[in-house]
């Protein structure tokens, strides 16, 4: 089914954000695990997998619309050097992604592509949940201090 060119452009832009997130979150996960912060590492690993699932759905949709998924133009990863920076980098990426998602949703509405719109709304909901998690973690660091925060994230949840 031939899709709207601008919808395909939006889907590819969102796909690019997801590809950045997959790699960024995966690296952050491994860094936290290496530092002994197993709870943070496990959570970040699952976020990376969620982003991979989003990318998969976007690729399927782009192909269905007879577009070409762009997996080559990988943007810059935002890699922190410490836990607080890493959380902030993830938050910055998610805030950009949600802005792009909202713009894409508006366009899909305008051209009556409700299937793409619904896919993007599902991804937006997931990204908003991640933003809430990241804001909560950064808030906890402010409330309990970095050392207490880090100590509470040394062991994985059972």
UniProtKB/Swiss-Prot annotation:
One CC-aspect GO term: cytosol
Impact noted for substituting residue 148 to L: About 70% active in Fe(2+) oxidation and storage, diiron-binding site does not coordinate fully, decreased overall flexibility of the BFR, loss of 1 ligand to K(+), reveals more Fe cations bound inside the BFR cavity
Knockout-associated phenotype: No growth phenotype in iron-sufficient conditions, cells do not store detectable iron under any conditions tested, cells secrete less pyoverdin siderophore and deplete iron from the medium slowly. Very low amounts of FtnA-only BFR complexes accumulate in vivo at low O(2) levels.
GO terms of molecular function: ferric iron binding; ferroxidase activity; heme binding; iron ion binding; iron ion sequestering activity
Needed cofactors: heme b
CDD domains reported in the protein's UniProt record: Bacterioferritin (cd00907)
InterPro entries listed in its UniProt record: Bacterioferritin, Ferritin-like, Ferritin-like_diiron, Ferritin-like_SF, Ferritin_DPS_dom
Other observations noted: The unstable catalytic diiron-binding site within each subunit (Fe1 and Fe2, ferroxidase center) also serves as a pore for iron uptake; the ferroxidase center is labile. In the iron-loaded BRF crystal structure additional stably-bound iron ions are seen inside close to the ferroxidase pore. Mutagenesis of residues reveals other stably bound Fe cations in the interior of the BFR shell; they may represent a pathway followed by Fe(3+) to the central iron storage core.
Name used for this protein in its record: Bacterioferritin BfrB
Organism: Pseudomonas aeruginosa (strain ATCC 15692 / DSM 22644 / CIP 104116 / JCM 14847 / LMG 12228 / 1C / PRS 101 / PAO1)
